Amino acid sequence: MNKNIFITLLISLLLLSGCTGDTCIDPDDFGFIKFNVSARYDPEEITSRQEGNQVAPWRDSAYKVNGYPLTIMVRPWSYILGDKNTSGQLSAWCPWYGQKNNTTTLAAFCVKLQPCTFWDNTRLDMCTPNPANQNDAMISNAPCIMTNGVGLYFLIAAKNTDPNISPDSQSKPQGITQHLGEELTSGYEFYSTSSTGQFSKAGGINYQYKGEDKSKYAQSPLYFKIIDKFYNDNSGQYRLVIKSGVTDTRADPLQFLTDLIKGVLFGKDGIIKKTYQQIIDTSGYRMSVSAILTLYIMFTGFSFLIGNINLTHVELIVRILKVSIVSILLSTDKAWTFFHDYLFVFFIDGVQQILQIINEASATGPGSQSLLGLLISPQTLSKLFSLLFVDWLGFIYIILYLIALYFIFFLIFKATIIYLTALITIGMIIIMGPIFICFMLFNITRSLFENWLRQLISYALQPIILFTGIAFISMIIRTEIYSTLGFAVCKHDFPNLGPINEIFGSFLEDIDPSLGHSIFYWWFPVPMKGGINNFHKANILVPKDHIVVDDSCKNDPDKCKHCAAYECIDERYIELPFLDLVKDAKRISNFINGKFVQLDGILLIFVSIYLLSKFNDTAISTAQFIAGTSGNLTEIQKVNQQSYESAAKQMNRPLNYVAKTVSAPVTSRVSAGKEQVRMFFAEKFENMMMGRLEKQALGSSANKTVQNEVKRKYGIDSKDVKMNAITDYENGIAGLLKNLPKGNELKAKELSQMKFTQLRDKIAANKYGVKDYAALSKEQKAELDKSLKDANLRELASDANFTRDYQDAYKNAHQEMSGRGVGLFGKNIGVLRSWQEIKHRVDTKRKLKEEKRVGIGEKIYAGYTGIKRGVLTAIVGKDLRDAYEGNLTSAEWHDFEYNDPRLRTYSEKLKDDEKAREHEELQMHINKEALAAQADILSPEYLARLEKAGRHSDVEYYQELAQRKLIHEVHGRLFEEGEPVMMGDRFMREKATDSQMRDMIDNAHRKHAEFIDGDRYIRRQEHYDIMHEKAQENLEQTYKELKDHFKRDDIKIEEMPALIAQKVKDTAEGAEIDQKITEELNNFNADVKNYEYSTEVLNKIEDRKQAITDEVNAQIDKINKYRENAKMQTYVKPIVNEGRKLRKLEDHLRNMK
């Protein structure tokens, strides 16, 4: 059970590690915010002030600054060093030669340009927003490309302002603007890992707020813009990485659940507010509060008059306040607003704000603020799995990490359950507020009010104490993750399968250019090898919170400076930015020596997990002790524990949990919902893979093994397929549409998916305004036929359909091989493939043998019950038998299976199952014969070749196999679910009505047409029709020429080669007579061969069509027999196959005389 969960978790995390979209991941990248800023704008976005002076809007990053140092890095880019001009890698722009489609790519002319250099490197600010500076950049080598952030500005907009509200605000925005392309002068550099695995200097900025700006601009929106005077010819983009300084709005794995429940309870129209207002709106409650206030005022006055109380100024003010507070409950408009804004807000929003502060404080470095989000981020997992092949301890570390992740997930989930339980309880307590607030008036009920308030405080403190402990443990775990996995990694093809890597690489680039080179890859550390020469020191921004200990604070640690992430500069290895050169010397030494696995770090993580589990158990009792409610009857800890255990059981044993706790209808709906979601993604992935296989089938990268499988099982040789036929057909249609008056109303791509007859109908309707081709006049038909023939569309359509059939066959063969256990390596390695095929055949035979054994037993028992049933019918009659059959015989064997679409009895179903097994055995035999012949032995083409070779016995044998298989296929199509042509025998004899049988016969006609239209062999008829017509036309022309030349009417086919040669000698002149004779004879022989071959193939296709028709008619005859037995009116509607038998060439020429 737990093993299955662990395996599922491992597979999920492996897949998740491939979702980063980057070729390389920087050492300090544990989930940075990344996006692109384009140098181009849509024309409608730009405002032109005057010639050559355009103003463009600021790009909203959708993030807000949080007051911490704002660190933004601009990715380096160099075409010379191997970076690609794609949206996933490009980080440069060019102020020249851009086109509309260059939003995320450089113009072709700019790709190989050098980076821009400047006459004055201190003046890189081009077209700055400062109105006093409108000078152009001082470029010395134009044309060139801008890199490292030159021309890119960020804007921290002033609160409640919109920099894009007008052109003036776009050019002179309110807020803080800084240029990201300035040379860094603060003693540090940015470094980034390029797509080739090399560390390169990058552009960027580390902006630290001055004075009051930190609080003034906190939570202000962040904008970006590449500033230029003329945008219409720009191309390219900058790829930005925000390392710190913004509030991460990406959802936490468990935050969605928390926000959902909080919104339902405490939202604007939440349950708590509605229930609270319903209570105070109740007339009975208002009367009770009025009575209580009246009694309280009366008792206070009476007690004062008799001297029972001493009303001091303080006591009087307290009593007046009590009366005022309770009186507010009588005001339905102000009651919720008053108590929510001045009391309940501290227990709802106040707790949420404190938790947010705690979470921000625990986020001591890059990555998600949530510990769980950090641990399962694609960047973290990529670095984790990179350890597998660089150190023999890597596998152990990965297993320990996943075990730790498993426990951390459940501990945080348990903490979330505690928090949500406390939140719900707070809501329940607030709902009871209108009742308990009234209890503060009298001494006898005051204790109830005080307990109510204590409970409210207790449940508000629980999540604060709980998440304070989690934050403390989180900081420890974060530090270890940063120190252990704080190195760069890059994708490398692994295993390197040569052309296969390129195939799947182009497949992924079609989806997203940022996805990499191949799906066969693994992450490896950078540098992959140890050695001091592979590590480089530099002054960099330290990427995590730390305390700077220098000479000024050695004696007084309180005076040491605390630096937030990316606030302070220190000398460190750029490959290991989290490790201090002195404190972490041992770990640095391990990395330099090639030891990437730090087991002491994972040990500390497990210690932290143990502490976290203990803290979870004590947090509630601590909150109860502080609030003074530890002795109350409500034991929230037990409630939380029960909630957690139930949820844990659901995760560990989902099937048992659903079966025990949820009713069957709910279970089926949940299962259906899961299946629907699963099928949605499966369908998307399958469509994607099928599209890839379609492209692969027509490309040079097509798998030879799959092509041989297509030839063997589907009778299509890839050599006979015109790979560009679909494109040629579409181009031919497009050319024809240009000559039509309303041709622009049709789309060539859509028409190219149709058959030739459908295409002809569409063009007839478009050109002549009729319904279809049949509605044309004789002259119009002749005109249209001529234009279609001139465009050669019929032949192009035939070739395109043949190519599509080949693509379908390629996909089916690929899937069938995978279904037989022949995987990716088996499709490329013959020995492995043979072993996999043998294993599949053995397994299939074993399965059929077992099914046959079970079927024989069931058949014997069914026969026995049938005898009992017959005897009972003879003794008591049919009606009495039906009444008592359930008790006297095994009725389930002979009664209808109402879950069966054909309403068969179980015994009838057994017979059909036996036929299905016979079909499987027949298919295995056919596959064996096809494997021996290395061809599709049932295809008309193969049978025609055997016929021509004189192997008549083989033809008869294979035709007999084809006939048996065809009968099974026709039955399968006629009896398939939905609208079966024939129901069970008992139903047809006893229950079927006249209208049902008529519908069955009509349905048989429809399915016959569908079967004929979809049969993969019959679909080739158009291809061979064209071949036959061309050969016939050429031969008739040759025969006519010979007839006219030699004045003979009795020319035989065997004479024609000699007569052709003589005719060429009689009519041709020059030295090339022999060459022309050879050419004419070759053409004649090719025409004869094509005629005879196509004639034989077409006759075989007609035989197949007739066999299908005969079998469907046999089923129709059966239905009519049932009708006759039931004394119903005759409804005979057989199918007539309008086939043809083509004559041999000798007979055809003889008929021409």
Curated annotation (Swiss-Prot):
It holds the Pfam family TrbL. The chain crosses the membrane at residues 289-309, 393-413, 422-442, 457-477. PROSITE patterns: PROKAR_LIPOPROTEIN (PS51257). It comes from Rickettsia conorii (strain ATCC VR-613 / Malish 7). GO terms for cellular component: plasma membrane. The lineage of its organism: Bacteria, Pseudomonadati, Pseudomonadota, Alphaproteobacteria, Rickettsiales. Its main location: membrane. It is a multi-pass membrane protein; Lipid-anchor. This is Uncharacterized lipoprotein RC0146. It is found in: Cell membrane. Residues 1-18 form the signal peptide. Disulfide bonds: none annotated. Keywords: Cell membrane, Lipoprotein, Membrane, Palmitate, Signal, Transmembrane, Transmembrane helix. GO terms for biological process: protein secretion by the type IV secretion system. A lipid is attached at C19 (N-palmitoyl cysteine). Belongs to the TrbL/VirB6 family. A lipid is attached at C19 (S-diacylglycerol cysteine). The keyword Cell membrane applies. InterPro entries: Conjugal_tfr_TrbL/VirB6.
